[in-house]
């Protein structure tokens, strides 16, 4: 019988929307996660705060319409238990057929 060592460790590079969601999903599945983000050391023109899950603009989450790519993706993320979608819905601002959030409140909710 061969013994196997299973390591439950993941390093996620980037603390943007995708990186934060990936890290959270991995933790929920029992992995030990290290999340590395460069903005705390070096900022770019797009970074305002250096915080995790920082959005470029308040409507970055786009359309809610079920026949648009953004609407389809949001439904898929919700079915997967997305942390980011749960946070976005908690602080959503009324904006018609677009999911708009207060960027600073969103970042705090994710963190």
Predicted stretch roles:
Residues 17-20, 108:
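Short alpha-helical segments and helix-capping/turn motifs at coil-helix boundaries
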Residues 18, 24-87:
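N-terminal FAD cofactor-binding segment of flavoenzymes
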């Amino acid at each position: 019988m061969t013994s196997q060592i299973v390591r439950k460790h993941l390093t996620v590079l980037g603390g943007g929307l995708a990186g934060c969601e990936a890290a959270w999903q991995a933790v929920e599945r029992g992995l030990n996660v290290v999340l590395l983000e460069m903005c705390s050391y070096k900022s770019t023109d797009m970074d305002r705060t250096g915080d995790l899950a920082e959005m470029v603009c308040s409507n970055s989450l786009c359309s809610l319409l079920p026949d648009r790519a953004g609407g389809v993706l949001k439904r898929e993320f919700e079915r997967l238990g997305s942390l980011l979608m749960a946070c976005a819905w908690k602080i959503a601002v009324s904006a018609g057929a677009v999911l708009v959030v207060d960027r600073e409140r969103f970042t705090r909710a994710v963190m």
